[in-house]
């Protein structure tokens, strides 16, 4: 049997989800909405491509914004 030639896999570098100048804050609603699902749930770290520290800070910021009624707890737009 012939062996297939080994192809080099190009590593696609993804852009970081949070740019260096952006600050995770409960008042930054545009940033927070990027990490919520359509139903209003917080997306997982694996889906968001965040570090553990960033995910914890993001979760706290989202919860603070929900308590202050800046973003809804659930999106029930039917």
UniProtKB/Swiss-Prot annotation:
Pfam families: Ribosomal_S18. The keyword Cell division does not apply. GO terms for molecular function: small ribosomal subunit rRNA binding; structural constituent of ribosome. InterPro entries: Ribosomal_bS18, Ribosomal_bS18_CS, Ribosomal_bS18_sf. Residues 1-20 are annotated as: Disordered. It is found in: Plastid, Chloroplast. One of its GO terms (cellular component) is chloroplast. One of its GO terms (biological process) is translation. Keywords: Chloroplast, Plastid, Ribonucleoprotein, Ribosomal protein, RNA-binding, rRNA-binding. Residues 1-16 have a biased composition (Basic residues). Belongs to the bacterial ribosomal protein bS18 family. PANTHER family: 30S RIBOSOMAL PROTEIN S18 (PTHR13479), SMALL RIBOSOMAL SUBUNIT PROTEIN BS18M (PTHR13479:SF40). Part of the 30S ribosomal subunit. NCBIfam families: S18. This is Small ribosomal subunit protein bS18c.
